[in-house]
UniProtKB/Swiss-Prot annotation:
Its EC number is 4.3.1.17. This is L-serine dehydratase. Keywords: 4Fe-4S, Gluconeogenesis, Iron, Iron-sulfur, Lyase, Metal-binding. The keyword Transferase does not apply. It comes from the Bacteria. One of its GO terms (biological process) is gluconeogenesis. Pfam families: SDH_alpha, SDH_beta. GO terms for molecular function: 4 iron, 4 sulfur cluster binding; L-serine ammonia-lyase activity; metal ion binding. It catalyses: L-serine = pyruvate + NH4(+).
Length: 455
């Protein structure tokens, strides 16, 4: 079972597949060397990056992420402020301290980390790491795939289902299974997910994790609305959340313009995604590129519907996480595999479901909200300008946040049965993504990415 611990992970920007995943892969490689008793023999490390991971890698800080992973750091606890200085020293010395300084190996930034424009067979995001001894003889080589949302898998385990050692009370493979559990047991969708999570991780751990997820999201919004300036990279995109926040604070009277609610939702989403673009601390929800939608919709609920309680936060994230797990199991949450419908589309679907849940929707209405949100994201391309998670990504999160709220409201006010089910729209999304030309799947070779010139 895909857990909320998997769907919501604290990490750093700008990308879950191109930053968080590669950092975890680098750390995993070092851990493997230690397990194989080859750590001490290693004197040099070589990295080859392929496919979408390569084509947009520099804009997504993939190279930096891999190096930080090899250095022994993980996305959830790496000191963001030390990264630039650490990387600069590696560039100057051609030496890399690995496993938090336990050993120093040769690593020339230009020659030991190579971006290839070719694709590996198993997935669009591939990377191979090789350890060499003092004679430059290969000690160990492993290929990893970053399959979206910060998930990684090595070549030997690719495509193999990871079996839970713990039996959950409500196993499911699709939305139909979930709705049957809810109907048979008189449970809300979030309760079904909670009972499964308790079986896997224990109630205390689940509550602590979800509390930390929301606190991290809140901190991200707060930092975003108080930070101005230009985002990193050649696009020189100015931050907008702070100025929008000031404008909204200056006039809080909604009666003059009820649509100002949308401005607030936009601001929440922009704040989070600007933090992500700047390499800040964010939560994969389910990816970094789509990390603004779920927090923006919950922040909307808190400001305009009702104060948040720990129970409401948990129910929202559990329902959203459960819907996200269906996409992870039966389709993809990787922009490199299925386009932006797998990132912003999935986040929109998750947020719509979460909102419907805490607004009192029954399990069917929650699934209808998720379906509506995805249905109107089908075919969404991933064409980041300059290979960066900025244009169109930041604004797109704001648009999708509003769309999620609308999808939820439409589902709750529907009086007829839908013709399209959530399971069918998930299936359609995956097929659409696989049919999509590769230049629209996070390669920056089509769409806006080739129309907008980076100076």
């Amino acid at each position: 079972m895909i857990s909320v611990f998997d769907m919501f992970k604290v990490g750093i920007g700008p990308s879950s597949s191109h930053t968080v995943g590669p950092m975890k892969a680098g750390k995993q490689f070092i851990d493997d060397l230690i397990k194989r008793n080859q750590f001490e023999q290693t004197t040099e490390i070589h990295v080859d990056v392929y496919g979408s991971l390569s084509m947009t890698g520099r804009g997504h800080s993939t190279d930096i992420a891999i190096i930080m992973g090899l250095a022994g750091y993980l996305p959830h606890n790496v000191d963001i402020d030390m990264i630039s200085g650490f990387i600069e020293k590696v560039k100057q010395t051609a030496l890399l301290p690995i496993n938090v300084g336990q050993k120093i190996v040769k690593f020339d930034f230009e020659n030991n980390l190579i971006f290839h424009r070719t694709f590996l067979k198993l997935h669009e995001n591939g990377m191979t790491i090789t350890a060499l001894d003092e004679n430059r003889t290969e000690l160990y080589r492993q290929t990893y795939y970053s399959i979206g949302g910060g998930f990684i898998v090595d070549e030997a385990h690719f495509g193999k289902e990871e079996k839970n050692t713990v039996q959950v009370p409500y196993p499911y493979k699709n939305a139909e299974d979930i709705l049957k559990h809810c109907s048979d047991n008189g449970l809300m969708l979030s309760t079904v997910m909670l009972e499964n999570e308790i079986a896997l991780n224990g109630k205390e751990a689940v509550s602590a994790h979800l509390e930390n997820v929301w606190k991290t999201m809140q901190a991200c919004i707060e930092h975003g609305i108080h930070t101005e300036g230009i985002l990193p990279g050649p696009l020189r995109v100015p931050r907008r959340a702070a100025s929008l926040y000031r404008a909204l604070q200056a006039n809080t009277n909604l009666s003059n313009d009820p649509m100002r609610v949308i401005d607030w939702v936009n601001m929440f989403a922009l704040a989070v995604n600007e933090e992500n673009a700047a390499g800040g601390r964010v939560v994969t929800a389910p990816t970094n590129g789509a990390c603004g939608i779920i927090p923006a919709v919950l922040a909307y609920y808190e400001k305009f519907i009702s104060p948040l309680t720990p129970e409401i936060i948990e129910r929202y994230l559990l329902a959203a996480g459960m819907i996200g797990s269906l996409y992870k199991m039966n389709a993809s949450i990787s922009g490199a595999e299925v386009g932006c419908q797998g990132e912003v589309g999935v986040a929109c679907s998750m947020a719509a479901a979460g909102l419907a849940e805490i607004l009192g929707g029954n399990p069917l209405q929650v699934c209808i909200a998720a379906e509506i949100a995805m249905e109107h994201n089908l075919g969404l391309t991933c064409d980041p300008v300059g290979g960066q998670v900025q244009v169109p990504c930041i604004e797109r999160n704001a648009i999708a946040s509003v769309k999620a709220i609308n999808a939820s409201r439409m589902a709750l006010r529907r009086t007829t049965n839908p013709r399209v089910t959530l399971d069918k729209v998930i299936e359609t999304m995956y097929e659409t993504g696989k049919d999509m030309n590769a230049k629209y799947r996070e390669t920056s070779q089509g769409g806006l990415a080739v129309k907008i010139v980076c100076n």
